[in-house]
Amino acid sequence: MEKIELVQKMKCDHEGEEYLIEVFARPDGSHFARTIFSPSDVIISDGISLDEVLLKHQDLLPLAIHSRQMHFPSRTLN
């Protein structure tokens, strides 16, 4: 199993709500960031460097939050 290391934790405020971002390093030097909305709802961003993965994740997080707040009308079958 690949050994990963938690290298940074930060909270991101979006529209008055705080979201935890955890950043991990892999043995090969690459990184990934993770935000857990629920046990079955997680977003992950991959990157080569810590800076790259943080930029990607901070761009993705508002979109992920917004998509979870959208209400889709139920579809009916005719």
Locate the predicted segments by residue.
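A short, structured beta-strand/loop element
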Residues: 19-44
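Homeobox/homeodomain signature
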Residues: 9-13, 33-34, 51
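Mixed-charge, Lys/Arg-enriched low-complexity segments
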Residues: 1-2, 40-78
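Short N-terminal "domain-start" leader segments
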Residues: 1-27
